[in-house]
Each structure stands twice: as structure tokens, then as C-alpha cells.
């Protein structure tokens, strides 16, 4: 197996998901650990959300503040730590078509399965924020053409997703967004289309039926979102939930912080007891981070004199190890 084999396999897997006539649910977040959690929960792909990267790296909104190096470094870590395909949010491509060329090639080299580039003006705004403005159709098509050419020079399996933000922009309409999406595929060469801010079932169903490429969407309508079965019946290929893991983590952290301030250590005991009874309590968290691999490498390659003394020290011992003695309390003094 070569270094690139796992990367190629994940890219081919992502293309297989896009080619299937069924819905794929794609959770999103910002960290390798969240991607691993999604993998362990049985999801087939994961989204590195630019909004979450901005929030958790810098504590700022999704306004084009993160840079290419931020994205590529994070994407590389995420791709290396999980076995499912990663689609990354490359915002506007960090510039014009020339910048897009380098953005795509850096992301290809990072080992992810694909990237999305949106048609907003720079500096961009969040895909759910008011005040968005879009570049011209010609400029957008040129950016996607540049993305495809840069991709083809390195790995044609890498997926280019074109995101259309016209529906949420000033004066935008479904008719214009629909025509743009078709042009991004027909003239730009995009493999996947993200119709952003779609608000009605009728519009989404038409987009899935008539755009000549798989469609990705996030529901933005005022009425309740379609069920996953309804999405699949419409022909939607990817239902994206870009912030769900981070939102769940923030909600839990906020709850626990307030309970700790109000009740002291009792809150931690209650929280740990509840976690132990939940699905989370059944997760091997050390295995999730790769601790067994560390122990295996120590046992295989370190001299006996240099190996960590798991038997005689306090703390966690890898479950597979020979040192099975339970942790002993630390001696006072």
C-alpha cells in the first residue's frame, strides 16, 4: 500500500456516494475528533465547516477571516485521522480564479475528498447571514473552471462542489439561482451543486430533478424541514448539517458550566453519572484518540528499559495490554 492509497479510496468512496440514487446524510464540524465520532456513529462522510473553523480557531464569525493555511492545515489533520471522506468548506476560494487554482491544489495535497467554493463576493458572509452579495455569473464560472483544471492536474477523483448563494443575496431569485447552478455544472464543470438558502419543497425538488449534477442542500424554509425520506424522494443526494456537532458540544458545555457554578462538584458527579448511562458512556474515548496504537508502538519498538511502566503507575492502562493490575491510589507525600 502506498501513502496515497487511503486518500484515493476515500475520494472514490465519495464519488460512489454521489453516484448512488439515495440520500447521504453529512454531519459537519471543525475537528478531527468530531469527524472520528461521525465515523464511529456510522456516517459515511463529514464536512469541515468554515464557520466552525472561524469560530473555534479564532472566536470570530464566518466573514472570510480564516485563510488558506488555516483551512489546509486543519483539513490535513482531519483527513489523516478518519477513514471516511471529508468535504471541506473553502469559502470563496480565497480570491479570484487564480487564487482558486492554488486553493484546490493545496486541498488535493491535504488528502481530503473534495471542496466547496461559493459564488459570493469577498469578503464573504456566513451562508445564513443577511447582506450577501454574489459575483457575476461569468466570473463564477471562471472560478469553477479554474478549480476543475487545477484538480485534473493532480487527481481527477477529487470532487469540486459549486455553492450558489444567490437565493440569499439581495435581489436574488430561485430562477437566477437555478440557472447559475446549471451553468456551474455545464460550463464550469462542477461535480456537485450546493443550492444554498432553499426555502420550499417545490424549489428543492425541481433543482434535484433538473440540475445535471447531484445536489446538496441545507433547509432554510420557515416550515419544518422535510424528513430524510422526503429528501430522498425529491432526489436530494446530500443533506448537510454543518454545525450540528459543534452546536451539541457548545450546548453541553454551557449547561455544565452553569451547573458547576451553581452546584459545585455535585454537578460534575451528576454529569458523569448521566454520561455513563448514555450512549456516550459506551464509547471507548481513549481508543477514539488512538491510545492503543501508542501502546502498541511502545511495546513493539522501544527497548524494555525505555518502555513506560504501566504496571506500577497510577492511571489508565490500555485494555489490550498485559499489565492488568487496576490503578492504585497515589501514595501521600
Regions found by a protein language model. Give the residues of each.
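Extended, intrinsically disordered, low-complexity segments
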Residues: 2-8, 14, 244-333
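Alpha/beta enzyme core
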Residues: 3-217, 221-241, 248, 258, ...
